[in-house]
Amino acid sequence: MRRCLNTRPGETGMDVTSRCTLGDPNKLPEGVPQPARMPYVSDKHPRQTLEVINLLRKHRELCDVVLVVGAKKIYAHRVILSACSPYFRAMFTGELAESRQTEVVIRDIDERAMELLIDFSYTSQITVEEGNVQTLLPAACLLQLAEIQEACCEFLKRQLDPSNCLGIRAFADTHSCRELLRIADKFTQHNFQEVMESEEFMLLPANQLIDIISSDELNVRSEEQVFNAVMAWVKYSIQERRPQLPQVLQHVRLPLLSPKFLVGTVGSDPLIKSDEECRDLVDEAKNYLLLPQERPLMQGPRTRPRKPIRCGEVLFAVGGWCSGDAISSVERYDPQTNEWRMVASMSKRRCGVGVSVLDDLLYAVGGHDGSSYLNSVERYDPKTNQWSSDVAPTSTCRTSVGVAVLGGYLYAVGGQDGVSCLNIVERYDPKENKWTRVASMSTRRLGVAVAVLGGFLYAVGGSDGTSPLNTVERYNPQENRWHTIAPMGTRRKHLGCAVYQDMIYAVGGRDDTTELSSAERYNPRTNQWSPVVAMTSRRSGVGLAVVNGQLMAVGGFDGTTYLKTIEVFDPDANTWRLYGGMNYRRLGGGVGVIKMTHCESHIW
């Protein structure tokens, strides 16, 4: 070994080393070469260590505890169980008798569920499914395995349906899963018209029925539906529930009924007529309806109109370029609340991303992450507010790519791969999780906009790598061929494109010299483009989408500033008007519109 100091004859290395340790033991004196260092962290070590420990468990080697669950004996290591479960840590490190026992009996837990959880402790893997979730969640709660509790709740969220939401709600309540309980409550309220017809609804105890019908957000067309649901519930087990009718009826908002229904249906029902408290509630409602001048003095929970959260289309703005870098953030605009809210971000930053909606799922294709061109694809599920990356990648990297859906396939059109501008077109089959090449365009196009109309896929404008284009091509999937159609009046790259009132609108973008505010539209019946009134702002890299019948231009770049503002086109007044703004400024982001069929947007 090299000495740390030059020594005189007779000096020993030990003496010298002792001098070296004076002061900082890790620092050699000045002038002495510092030893080379290479910190090393193994990614394999944790996994390989667990694998070996799991093999020891399976061979019953070095095991120091046996868990007895019913008729099952499970061999394990206390240190592993204690590291994974606060329940076992308290058991084995405290003064409990179990800390000294080699066999420990675990009660009130399913054998198979315990096996799965012990396996998870050794492997980090578990499969939650319909057949085990009802035993797995209670077991995870007992062992205080929060990660598995969350996984079970996430699984149950995805299974929510009008036929089972009440059962899931009760299950969540029993096991104190507050988030799952909240989501099940919201789902029940939003889908009450279907829920009230389910067997689970008829089996509800009175207190849970009252909880549901007391909500201001109960989604019903009229209070008649609530009354009918209550009476159906009572008559399902009339002898047992008849005494509970007055208590439940207090939470039906009888003053909101029409006079005809109140008198003709409610007041004449034998169950109502035979109970004094019920008759009093009907009389209260009659007075409210017949004496409008007295209504200010009669306000209360039963006179408060319900305010259900209505469902509709929701606009998503995905990725883009902001503050000098590509971004992964995603936000959504709900016209019902007139609010932009952040949702789950993508796993990658993506500018020049292609976005479209297939089977109520939002796809983000390719783009550029600030340093690399991407061929990866992500898929967003609005029901769970989660992105997944298990979608097959495109055959080549693509940014400034056009993406649209036609005939159940997701098409990726043109773009650039970092080397050249592309005319390549491929389509994704979600059933096969596979991309397949189709006929290429006649022209290379980056910054191209795409739209689907009349069974055809249109590729509008873009740049051939040298200059912006005004040319347009149309793809016929039956022939697998592209055909050239009438060109636009203006050359545009990085434009926005959407189908509105059976015509293709092309807005903004950039020509040879500047960002554009102009707009035009294509009539397929005449094969002609005609000008449309210009937007209030120049917008290159703009997103264009139709949301609940409104044409909206989203974000972009005006030549000076990245934009977060929105404009809406009014075809009657032939004007664009500003319509608020996003949370983030976005250039080259994608937009997509999803119909929220069960009001998922208000669940998470």
Curated annotation (Swiss-Prot):
Does the record's keyword annotation contain Transmembrane? Answer: no
Q: Which InterPro entries match?
A: BACK, BTB-kelch_protein, BTB/POZ_dom, Gal_Oxase/kelch_b-propeller, Kelch-typ_b-propeller, Kelch_1, SKP1/BTB/POZ_sf
According to the entry, every stretch annotated as the BTB domain falls at: 63-130
Q: Which SMART domains match?
A: BACK, BTB, Kelch
Give UniProt keywords alphabetically: Cytoplasm, Kelch repeat, Nucleus, Protein transport, Repeat, Transport, Ubl conjugation pathway
> What cystine linkages occur within this chain?
none
The record's listing under PROSITE patterns reads:
BTB
* Ranges occupied by Kelch repeats: 314-360, 362-408, 409-455, 457-502, 504-549, 551-596
Q: What residue stretches are annotated with the BACK domain?
A: 165-267
Q: Which Pfam families match?
A: BACK, BTB, Kelch_1, Kelch_KLHDC2_KLHL20_DRC7
The principal localisation class reads cytoplasm
* Transmembrane annotation, as ranges: none
Q: Answer yes or no on keyword NAD.
A: no
Q: Which SUPFAM superfamilies match?
A: Galactose oxidase, central domain, POZ domain
Picking any one GO biological process from the record gives:
Golgi to endosome transport
> Main role?
Substrate-specific adapter of a BCR (BTB-CUL3-RBX1) E3 ubiquitin-protein ligase complex involved in interferon response and anterograde Golgi to endosome transport. The BCR(KLHL20) E3 ubiquitin ligase complex mediates the ubiquitination of target proteins, leading to their degradation by the proteasome. It also specifically mediates 'Lys-33'-linked ubiquitination.
Quaternary structure (record): Component of the BCR(KLHL20) E3 ubiquitin ligase complex, at least composed of cul3, klhl20 and rbx1.
Put simply, this protein is called: Kelch-like protein 20
Q: Which organism is it from?
A: Xenopus laevis (African clawed frog)
